[in-house]
Each structure stands twice: as C-alpha cells, then as structure tokens.
Amino acid sequence: MIVLQTIAVAFAMFSAIPVPQFDWNEKNMRYAMCAFPLIGAVIGAAWCVCGVLPLPGLAKAAGFALIPVWITGGIHLDGYADTCDALSSYGDREKKLEILKDPHCGAFAVIRLCSYFLAYFALCTCVSFTPRVGVLWVLALVLERALSGLAVASFPMAKNTGLAHTFATAADKTAVRRVLAVLAAVLCVGMAALGGWALVLAALAVLWHYHAVSQKQFGGITGDLAGWFLQKAELWMLAALCACQWGGLL
C-alpha cells in the first residue's frame, strides 16, 4: 500500500493524471522522488504511440510537443517561466527569489516560453520516428527526472519553503540518492548502447549548468529551478537526438 501511495504522490504532484485522494505523510513522501521518473516513462509511452500513428508530419510534431505538457499539466514549464523572469531581472539574490514567488507571468517569461515552444516544435519536425528512437526517448525522459530527483536530494536548497524543500525534507535522502544514482547510471549506459551518447552528454551538461546557476544566482535550488532544469534538459536532449539522426548515428 505504501508503495502505491508513494507512486500516487509523485503522479499527483508532478502530473495531471488523476490519482486517488489520500493524506500525504512522512511515510508515503519519503521515497516519492524515486517514483518521479515513472512519469517520464508514461510520457515516453504516449510519445511512442503518437510516433506510430499515421499522422501528417506537422500533426505528429505537434503531438510530440504537446504530450509532455498535457501529461504534466505544465508544472515544469511554470518553473521554467518563473526562472527565466528571475534570471532576466539581473537583480540580487533576494530579488530573484522574490520573482520566483510572484504568481504573475512577466514579459521575459512569455518571450522565453514562445521561443521554447517554437524550438521544441521545430526539433520535433526533424525527428524521424523509429522503434529505436522511441526507446531512446523514453529512456531520456526517465533520465531527466532521475537527475532532477537526484539534484533535489543532493543540492543545497535556496530557501526553507516551497515544493523542492518540502520533498527534500520529507525524503530519505541517502536512499533516494542511491536509488536515483544507480537508475541514472543504468539509463546512461542503456542510452549510450543505443547510440544516444550525445543525449547523455547533453543531460549531464545541463545538470552541471543547473548546479552552477542555482548556486551563483539563487544560493541553491527551488521547485521552479527544478522545472527550469527539466525543460532545458529535455530541449537539449531533443536537439541531440535530431543531431544524431542527421549524422546517421541512429
């Protein structure tokens, strides 16, 4: 029962998929970050279904771009937008953290979101779907969430409130780090074996950038920054996927 509740907590928080309602507590939140990557598997499965449907190229690309938003409910895009606003303010650390808490969407957030979707859609039009590509992208979506959860359990927090702090405080950090580190390592090996080493490098590069920016600009990570990382990792891995196909590696 605890295992199912733990999975339900992850899906309730990080997806728009309906799950049974129950009280969240220390037990069912302890390993919720370990279940977070499962959402990537669901998105990847839906992505593969879209890939095999007999749709026109542009319609298929639109499906590829919209599936992650539909399944997650846009929670990570919200963090991406808020973080873009904060970084574009060029204010001090306290000012940036205040902007992250502001529920309004600023001009820079709108510009970055439009640019993000345009780039994502353009890359999706370049994807030539094959079973190998489908499996590789499923692994990529799981990997980015494993790295995100690993960061929440490992990186310093910027503040003592918020989503990331709540899950980090409730988590058995040692166990979560071990599980997600092993999972991430296995995924990296699997992706490289499929010819997706460029996707692995892209994800790890964005993770390094995430750590550097969060420490320098915010003094640690927040839930918004976690969403910013996930969206950037996804975009750059998608670009790497297209590059691999264009280069004849897939």
Question: Which functions belong to the PLM regions below?
Answer:
Residues C34-T83, V135-L139, G196-K216:
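Membrane-embedded alpha-helical segments that form the functional core of polytopic membrane enzymes
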Residues A146-L180, Q217-T222:
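Solvent-exposed interhelical
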Residues P18-W24, I75, K95, G149-K159, ...:
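C-terminal ends of transmembrane helices
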Residues I67-C105, S214-A233:
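Acidic (Asp/Glu-rich) catalytic motifs at the cytosolic membrane interface
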